[in-house]
Amino acid sequence: MSDIKLFQLKGNSVTELAGHAVKLEKDLQFHVESNMEVLLGVRFLATEYGTGKTHKGRVDSLGLDENGCPVIVEYKRHSNENVINQGLFYLDWLLDHQAEFKLLVMEQIGREVAESIEWGGTRLICIASDFNKYDEHAVQQINRNIELMRYR
């Protein structure tokens, strides 16, 4: 598990910014999406992406990492909100709807990038204020590329 830390650069000086809880999950999502490439190394593609009538959900953020792997980012303010289960649900949806994601990449970035999507490295990033020991253990047991990130 990793923490997201922010720093302010002034000339040759670097200062870590103090962390604080966000009031709303949407605030956290907005800040990460606005800086996704810098914070996560992921190119932002879509926010609140609808999963259709069958799944009836919305993926918080979709992106593509520097290796061409699809990335789902799910956000929660608190640790007890089943972010991992929800993320796995959307990960399953994404792997079942590769053509739809490929079309999104084609529209946002271009055909060449869409043709070289690396599905074997599909990632799920769960961002929350904290995770419990059961979350951390569960992620180790699941044979998927899942990252837990705490914000402060």
Question: Model-predicted segments: where are they?
Answer:
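Charged, terminal alpha-helix-loop-beta segments
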Residues: 1-152
